[in-house]
């Protein structure tokens, strides 16, 4: 990824998440790195909650890669595109967002509700339109001199 390209780890992308929370039923949104760090969060979520959610969502994607072996998914094609947590009266949607990132969205509605369908569509639209900007650069190891 070129250094000139705006990325989620160098630019504030909270405006994207705040826009998602304007959809009916959407409570919170968190953009996270593949290693579980918060890159951006909606104004509706407390930082501590965002950090726990980012770590958990990252773990879900890791679990998804591991269990993909069950489907004989080849290496490189084993990263989930989305993970859905279906709770009574709530739903958590976690989407692969860009290079090294995911986007978690909490919706106050049942999985089969119109609110979840709209939230899912809005999230997919944001990801498809902004994937390069929702990406994060590879972390580099720093050696002390």
Language-model features: locations:
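Acidic, low-complexity cytosolic segments
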Residues: 2-26, 35, 39-145
């Amino acid at each position: 990824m070129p250094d000139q390209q705006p990325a989620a780890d160098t630019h504030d992308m909270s405006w994207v998440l705040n826009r998602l929370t304007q959809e009916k039923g959407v409570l919170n949104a968190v953009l996270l790195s593949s290693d579980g760090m918060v890159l951006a969060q909606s104004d509706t979520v407390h930082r501590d909650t965002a950090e726990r959610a980012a770590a958990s969502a990252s773990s879900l994607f890791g679990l998804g890669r591991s269990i993909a072996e069950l489907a004989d998914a080849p290496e490189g094609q084993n990263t989930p595109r989305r993970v859905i947590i279906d709770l009574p009266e709530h739903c958590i949607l976690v989407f692969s967002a860009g290079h090294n990132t995911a986007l978690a969205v909490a919706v106050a509605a049942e999985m089969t509700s119109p609110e979840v369908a709209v939230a899912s569509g809005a999230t997919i639209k944001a990801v498809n339109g902004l994937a390069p900007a929702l990406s994060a650069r590879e972390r580099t190891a720093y050696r002390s001199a």
